[in-house]
């Protein structure tokens, strides 16, 4: 298929330019925006109390789903390029993007990704899989984008496969 790269390339572009810039000009319903914000805050409060969930900077939380096989496995820096498998979903379980579904991991320069990933991924060891809980202000904020409503908390499953300096 000559255009098999199209969807991964578009996803990479969206992540590179940042989630917050992807929804220019969309004006969601103010009541829905407020309800989403409230639901997201309640979700993060609930998740923060679950076993194994740890706090990160800026109101994010994470849970190690698969630890690194090597306790001394390297961690990337923001200047590195990372190879990851990931799935992004809403708090209701709706998947909005998945390299797992495409069957092909993504390779990104970390410094070009959204802030949530620039903060979280350097904390991961090569070989780990995390579930990352991202407050709306580190995602799309108060703007909707495609299937993602405004003020949505995002949940990412991220597997750090490789690090390239």
How should these model regions be labeled?
Residues 2-165:
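Cross-family detector of peptidyl-prolyl cis-trans isomerase
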């Amino acid at each position: 298929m000559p255009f098999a790269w199209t969807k991964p390339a578009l996803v990479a572009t969206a992540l590179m330019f940042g989630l917050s810039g992807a929804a220019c000009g969309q004006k969601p319903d103010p009541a829905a925006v407020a309800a989403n914000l409230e639901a997201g805050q309640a979700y993060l409060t609930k998740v923060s109390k679950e076993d194994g969930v740890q706090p990160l900077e800026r109101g994010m939380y994470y849970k190690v789903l698969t630890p690194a096989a090597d306790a001394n496995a390297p961690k990337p820096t923001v200047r590195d390029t990372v190879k990851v498998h990931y799935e992004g979903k809403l708090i209701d379980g709706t998947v909005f993007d998945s390299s797992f579904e495409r069957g092909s991991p993504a390779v990104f320069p970390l410094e070009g990704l959204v802030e949530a990933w620039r903060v979280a991924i350097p904390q991961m060891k090569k070989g780990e899989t995390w579930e990352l809980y991202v407050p709306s202000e580190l995602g799309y904020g108060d703007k909707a984008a495609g299937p993602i409503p405004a003020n949505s908390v995002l949940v990412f499953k991220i597997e750090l496969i490789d690090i390239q300096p």
